């Protein structure tokens, strides 16, 4: 995955819009890979999460991956505001179909380290694709897009989602 220089500097917060109650994206769409956009099936797009994605099925897509629970509009807005306030740590992407319905998602969480000259490490998490949309390489495109974001915000290393799954299974095998 990403092999950015060891002297990583976080992207200034001004490159990521804060929603302030509007439907602005969670971060700048300039961080979306043009190559990934071009590789999506016709009619699909990938973009940063927006506040209005609650109504577009964001949580329903996450339910393919894990338990989400019942989340009210108010709870969604509180969590969205909290994530948005950490404007150089959280990068959540969604894939939308022609109807602007969310069919896939993934997250990049940026961790600050003391090592590697106060470097940044990216963690790709929560890759989920709606069951009826699987088989279109949308999960792969989400991972590629998040890796591109990680590289562009200065991460010297990225831990991919799939590797975590493999390692956790191997770890369980060793521990049993």
Regions inferred by a protein language model and the residue ranges of each:
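Conserved beta-strand in the GNAT
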Residues: 94, 101-110, 128
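Helix-loop element at the rim of GNAT/NAT acetyltransferase active sites that forms part
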Residues: 52, 60-73, 114
């Amino acid at each position: 995955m990403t092999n950015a220089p060891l002297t990583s500097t976080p992207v200034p917060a001004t490159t990521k819009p804060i929603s302030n109650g509007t439907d602005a994206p969670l971060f700048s769409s300039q961080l979306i890979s043009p190559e990934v956009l071009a590789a999506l099936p016709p009619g699909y797009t990938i973009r940063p999460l927006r506040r209005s994605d609650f109504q577009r099925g964001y949580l329903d897509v996450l339910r393919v991956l894990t338990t989400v629970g019942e989340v009210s509009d108010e709870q969604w807005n509180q969590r969205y505001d909290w994530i948005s306030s950490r404007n150089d740590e959280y990068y959540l992407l969604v894939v939308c179909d022609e109807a602007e319905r969310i069919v896939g998602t993934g997250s990049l969480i940026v961790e600050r380290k003391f090592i590697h000259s106060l470097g940044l490490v990216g963690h790709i998490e929560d890759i989920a694709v709606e069951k009826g949309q699987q088989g279109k390489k949308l999960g792969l495109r989400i991972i590629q897009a998040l890796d591109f974001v990680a590289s562009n915000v200065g991460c010297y290393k990225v831990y991919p989602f799939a590797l975590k799954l493999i390692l956790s299974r191997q770890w369980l095998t060793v521990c049993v």
